[in-house]
UniProtKB/Swiss-Prot annotation:
Primary localisation category: membrane
Any one of the GO CC terms: plasma membrane
GN (gene name): mscL
GO MF terms, alphabetically ordered: mechanosensitive monoatomic ion channel activity
Protein name listed in UniProt: Large-conductance mechanosensitive channel
NCBIfam families: mscL, PRK00567.1-4
Family: Belongs to the MscL family.
Length: 146
């Protein structure tokens, strides 16, 4: 019986609205991140690289130690580089994603504020009390006698 209780507890937890909403958000966020990365890498960075001299940002690096080659021309030791271009690319990705999320949250906040500011429908009249119902019945009976 302990296992079924554990499974029931897990099912109740997993099916809560917040957990499901969060899972959907993570999946959509992952897809959105790929789209933004493509926009940055394929649309924004090439013109920016062209403006600064035809440089591809992902190729930017500082060579701390050059590669070593043997007498036969084969590389014997790889170069040691600090690839700051990849960091710049990731930074631009982050800034655009953060800005997009900011705009989305701002839009949602504005929409919820407008919804909250909308005039509420007038409240329904309260149900008649027992006394009012009794008085109505008495009135109707008196009308029938006349």
């Amino acid at each position: 019986m302990g296992k079924s209780t554990f499974l029931q507890d897990f099912k109740a937890f997993a099916m809560k609205g917040n957990v499901v909403d969060m899972a959907v958000g993570v999946i959509i966020g992952g897809a959105f991140g790929k789209i933004v990365s493509s926009v940055v890498a394929d649309i924004i960075m090439p013109p920016l690289g062209l403006l600064i001299g035809g440089v591809n940002f992902t190729d930017l690096k500082w060579v701390m130690k050059a590669a070593e080659y043997g007498a036969d021309g084969k590389e014997t030791a790889a170069a040691v580089t600090l690839n700051y271009g990849n960091f710049l690319q990731a930074t631009f990705d982050f800034l655009i994603i953060a800005f997009s999320i900011f705009l989305f949250i701002k839009l949602i906040t504005k929409l919820t504020q407008k919804k909250a500011e909308a005039p509420a429908a007038p409240p329904a009249p309260p149900a008649p009390t027992k006394e009012e119902i009794l008085l109505t019945e008495i009135r109707d009976l008196l009308k029938e006698k006349q």
